[in-house]
């Protein structure tokens, strides 16, 4: 019997994996880690006696979740992406299934916060979960502030600097940092100095990133229209004004020098991957815009189904031809 952790390849996914590793280590369990993104195929073989944790991630299309659930002995899914949670609920309603996957799925918090809650509470009642989520360790809360965009409503939030501090680390180092953090927290160490040091590192790196991003945007950013094709029963496409950029390293902060909320609905970053697919990220600060829903529609309309994420940040995979020939129209062309 082997314990596996399948996790997303971003800060929230790495933090979730580190948290899970710390708690499993207290039980004498050393898990096998599988870093995933939506453009990757899970090719690993799982045994019928294995335990699988899927953290801050879901396999797409959703049938792959069902296939893995039916393969292994224990299947725990912890996620916070509203679009896929709603898809799961719709499948349950459509098929009339009364059972559900073990785990914790709740919008408004990050995967790391939910992972912390899951391992801390033997009774996973919603009341107990909400109570614990209000008292997560500071570093895990900062991950949530960043990943769910709560930081945008917090004056002088330290979440962006905290996230930036990990940009210089390998995935293994990030996972190890959070595993150590949680282990010491469980052993009642005071971690304030460690957290402050990490934030200060991030502040220094942010100064460099601001200058670098501003220079990058001068040659990479352009104004465009995003044409989102609705389901076939809807009357017409919806058109959004976007500031788009061809960029390998993404994040809404990269657009700081060119994003104008009074002109742009969405920030759109895209990159051609070595798989032959184009990964697209969407960001918005407008309350009336749901990037998760838009990403799902764009992904499903193209050659590769799937896509989604959060209201303020989401993504999908497509082809270069579909992105530049159908979805995105550069202003002036």
Residue ranges and their predicted role:
Residues 172-209:
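Long, charge-rich alpha-helical interaction segments
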């Amino acid at each position: 019997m082997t314990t596996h952790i399948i996790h997303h390849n971003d800060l929230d996914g790495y933090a979730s994996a580190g948290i899970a590793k710390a708690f499993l280590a207290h039980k004498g369990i050393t898990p096998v880690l599988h870093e995933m993104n939506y453009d990757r195929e899970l090719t690993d073989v799982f045994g019928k006696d294995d335990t699988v944790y899927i953290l801050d991630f879901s396999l797409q299309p959703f049938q792959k979740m069902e296939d893995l659930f039916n393969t292994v002995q224990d299947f725990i899914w912890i996620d916070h992406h509203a679009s896929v949670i709603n898809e799961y609920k719709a499948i349950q309603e459509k098929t009339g299934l009364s059972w559900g996957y073990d785990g914790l799925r709740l919008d408004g918090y990050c995967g790391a916060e939910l992972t912390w809650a899951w391992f801390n509470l033997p009774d996973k009642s919603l009341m107990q979960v909400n109570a614990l989520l209000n008292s997560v360790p500071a570093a895990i809360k900062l991950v949530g502030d960043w990943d769910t965009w709560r930081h945008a409503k917090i004056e002088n939030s330290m979440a962006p600097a905290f996230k930036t501090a990990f940009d210089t680390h390998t995935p293994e180092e990030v996972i190890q940092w959070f595993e150590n953090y949680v282990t010491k927290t469980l052993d009642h160490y005071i971690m304030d100095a460690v957290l402050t040091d990490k934030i200060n590192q991030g502040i220094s790196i942010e100064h460099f990133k601001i200058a670098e991003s501003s220079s990058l945007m001068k040659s990479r950013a352009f104004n465009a229209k995003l044409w989102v094709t609705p389901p076939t029963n809807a009357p017409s496409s919806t058109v959004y004004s976007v500031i788009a950029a061809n960029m390998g390293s993404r994040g809404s902060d990269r657009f700081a020098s060119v994003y104008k909320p009074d002109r742009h609905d969405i920030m759109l970053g895209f990159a051609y991957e070595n798989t032959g697919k184009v990964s697209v990220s969407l960001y918005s600060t407008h309350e009336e815009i749901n990037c998760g829903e838009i990403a799902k529609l764009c992904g499903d309309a193209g050659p590769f189904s799937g896509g989604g994420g959060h209201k303020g940040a989401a993504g999908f995979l497509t082809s270069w031809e579909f992105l530049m020939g159908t979805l995105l129209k550069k202003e002036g062309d």
